[in-house]
């Protein structure tokens, strides 16, 4: 007796989309757990509606897996394009997105002047802004060519040799002066944090600490679970603002609870000089970045990721340090781990394992510190340090200290490599090891530039 079996349907069923996004000008980016990280509304840029929708779709899909910084750079580039469209007056619909419009846009970029520097935008900045628009248009060409009624092409190498001008190099004395100031700031921040831990560990008076300060630190810690509250929340919870002002203000008092935006710069600069790492790669350093040296019990390996290092196989960046030195990178990282521990529990799942965590003053959220925040923190750091050095030199002119130069984080890696190259007597292999380069020609190119 035969049994009639039903035919098995082996066709693949189409999986429903995990996240349904409405087709509008608002672009929503989410992290790996589906939580909303950032919203951008292209419709608020003042562009024509059809162009705003075109750019929003390209932005939403092309940069879905990009880093937050890349997404922000694209957003800034779209803002620049919106300013051009408003000033040009000839971009009224997608039909006006033509090769001629690209030429006018390039000429407009050549005329832009930085608000802070009062100098024309660098060739690299102009090229990056143009590249972001080109990526949006190229994505639309591939996916929705019908939305571009006119031909639009972008010329190649608009600004040749955009990195021809070599970056400035800081000398050995400059680097030593910067490190000295960083260590002073780190010691001050660590002493304040240790005092805060001693205050919170007891309900009574702490030796050498004002009683009002003890009560104030405990009151602030209770308001928001050990994280510095906003001024509004602190007042609402009964914290006396007059007492806060007498003891340096909320920002200063935050240092008794955890790492703050003012003190993170010193830690970051010191680690950037010691590791000779790329600033953005160091910013993404994780909390489990240390491991024991396989042969030397006194040395610790510090490891961090560099997304651009390696083609198909990503190779981590590593440096080893002697922990017996008081300001060696592992000891600084241990302090960072302790000072950011109260923040780590409040961070999102995506940022929870990051080392450089800070509390955002605008959003009252704990996040990985943004690259722009670090860049903006350098100016006040240099200004405060030079003011302190000026007081020192006035009080002890016979032991005067050099002032800090005006520098940016991107200058540190090349400056450290140059000093290693000089100290090794021109050994390019020693410099290659410091920079964690796989190929020697990469090191030669970086040193010559």
Which stretches of residues belong to each language-model region?
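Extended accessory and catalytic-adjacent subdomains in large enzymes
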Residues: 36-46, 156-192, 230-449
């Amino acid at each position: 007796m035969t049994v009639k079996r039903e035919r098995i349907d082996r066709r693949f069923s189409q999986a429903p989309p995990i996240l349904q996004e409405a087709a509008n000008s608002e672009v929503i980016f989410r992290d790996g757990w589906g939580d909303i990280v950032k919203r951008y509304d292209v419709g608020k840029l003042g562009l024509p509606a059809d162009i705003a929708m075109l750019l929003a779709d390209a932005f939403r899909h092309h940069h879905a897996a990009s880093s937050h910084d890349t997404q922000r750079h694209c957003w800034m580039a779209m803002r620049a394009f919106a300013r051009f469209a408003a000033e040009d007056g000839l971009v009224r619909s997608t039909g006006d997105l033509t090769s001629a419009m690209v030429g006018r846009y390039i000429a407009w970029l050549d005329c832009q002047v930085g608000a802070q520097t009062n100098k024309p935008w660098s060739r690299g900045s102009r090229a990056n802004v143009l590249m972001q628009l080109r990526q949006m248009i190229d994505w639309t060409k591939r996916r929705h060519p019908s939305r571009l009624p006119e031909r639009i092409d972008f010329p190649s190498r608009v600004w040749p040799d955009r990195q021809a001008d070599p970056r400035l190099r800081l000398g050995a004395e400059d680097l030593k002066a910067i490190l000295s100031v960083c260590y002073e700031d780190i010691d001050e921040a660590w002493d304040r944090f240790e005092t805060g831990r001693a205050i919170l560990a007891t309900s009574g008076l702490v030796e050498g600490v004002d009683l009002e300060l003890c009560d104030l630190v405990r009151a602030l810690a209770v308001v928001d679970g050990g994280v510095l509250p906003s001024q509004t929340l602190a007042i609402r919870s009964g914290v006396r603002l007059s007492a806060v002002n007498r003891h340096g203000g909320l920002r200063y008092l935050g240092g008794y609870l955890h790492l703050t935006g003012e003190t993170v710069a010193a830690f970051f600069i010191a680690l950037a000089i010691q590791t000779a790492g790329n600033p953005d790669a160091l910013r993404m350093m994780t909390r489990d970045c240390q491991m024991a040296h396989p042969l030397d019990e006194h040395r610790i390996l510090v490891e961090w990721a560099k997304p651009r290092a390696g083609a198909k196989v990503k190779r981590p960046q590593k440096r080893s340090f002697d922990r017996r030195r008081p300001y060696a990178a592992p000891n600084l990282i241990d302090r960072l781990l302790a000072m950011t521990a109260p923040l780590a529990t409040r961070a999102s799942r995506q940022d929870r394992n990051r080392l450089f965590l800070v509390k955002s003053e605008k959003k009252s959220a704990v996040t990985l510190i943004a690259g722009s925040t670090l860049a903006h923190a350098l100016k006040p750091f240099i200004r405060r340090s030079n003011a302190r050095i000026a007081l020192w030199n006035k009080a002890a002119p016979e032991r005067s200290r050099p002032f800090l130069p005006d520098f940016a984080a991107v200058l540190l890696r090349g400056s450290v490599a140059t000093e290693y190259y000089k100290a090794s007597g021109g050994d390019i292999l020693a410099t290659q090891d410091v920079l964690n380069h796989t190929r020697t020609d990469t090191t030669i190119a970086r040193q010559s530039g």
